């Protein structure tokens, strides 16, 4: 008896079962597609390119051939609290994000790299609206967006070698409030979900 589900065919199942049991919940603040992944283990028809901005954006990246493969090399999953904290620490240790001027293009590149290498669906890096400091909606992500001081902007735009297309020279064109923002690490964001306190309306379905 046993057929195709005999003992020999389920080698490794205990490890898979244990991995499923230990699967972490999605972090507070991730998007609808990540909630699908958490609940069903896949993105369902309730989140498609037609009705979900993150799905539509990802599909567009795949069509554009953005410079590296956009199909993840690991299983697709939602961003978790622990993963967001660990990723924040990794980027802080490696450098490169702290004080970097934010632009949508730079955020897209970061999201795609994380999606490709870690499998986290790119609907987790969202922030509270401005003006002023923008706090991450995803609990555990320890980078906030902070307006750059006018003096620092003035200094950065001096000289003939300034690129007009550099985010610091675009004077906040990416931002609804026309503020130039930079990523800033804040260790307290691992313990204090500021976005949830400021905007509880964003978390009604969490």
UniProtKB/Swiss-Prot annotation:
Residues the record marks as site: Cleavage: 57-58
Annotated stretches, region: Binding to ATP6V1H: 148-180
GO molecular function terms noted in the UniProt entry: GTP binding; SH3 domain binding
Protein family (similarity comment): Belongs to the lentivirus primate group Nef protein family.
Keyword Signal: no
Organism field: Human immunodeficiency virus type 1 group M subtype B (isolate HXB3)
Lipidation positions, renumbered (N-myristoyl glycine): 2
Motif Diacidic positions after renumbering to this chain: 174-175
Quaternary structure and partners: Monomer; cytosolic form. Homodimer; membrane bound form. Interacts with Nef associated p21-activated kinase (PAK2); this interaction activates PAK2. Associates with the Nef-MHC-I-AP1 complex; this complex is required for MHC-I internalization. Interacts (via C-terminus) with host PI3-kinase. Interacts with host PACS1; this interaction seems to be weak. Interacts with host PACS2. Interacts with host LCK and MAPK3; these interactions inhibit the kinase activity of the latter. Interacts with host ATP6V1H; this interaction may play a role in CD4 endocytosis.
Compartments reported by the entry: Host cell membrane; Virion; Secreted; Host Golgi apparatus membrane
SUPFAM superfamilies registered for this protein in UniProt: Regulatory factor Nef (SSF55671)
Family matches, as InterPro entries: HIV-1_Nef_anchor_sf, HIV-1_Nef_core_sf, HIV_Nef
Upper taxonomic lineage: Viruses, Riboviria, Pararnavirae, Artverviricota, Revtraviricetes
UniProt comment concerning the protein's domains: The N-terminal domain is composed of the N-myristoyl glycine and of a cluster of positively charged amino acids. It is required for inner plasma membrane targeting of Nef and virion incorporation, and thereby for infectivity. This domain is also involved in binding to TP53. The SH3-binding domain constituted of PxxP motifs mediates binding to several Src family proteins thereby regulating their tyrosine kinase activity. The same motifs also mediates the association with MAPK3, PI3-kinase and TCR-zeta.
Chain spans, region SH3-binding: 69-78
Gene behind this protein: nef
Residues the record marks as site: Might play a role in AP-1 recruitment to the Nef-MHC-I complex: 20
Biological processes per GO annotation: symbiont-mediated suppression of host antigen processing and presentation of peptide antigen via MHC class I; symbiont-mediated suppression of host antigen processing and presentation of peptide antigen via MHC class II; symbiont-mediated suppression of host autophagy
Gene3D superfamilies to which the protein is assigned, alphabetical: HIV 1 nef anchor domain, Nef Regulatory Factor
Pfam families, per the entry: F-protein
This protein's name: Protein Nef
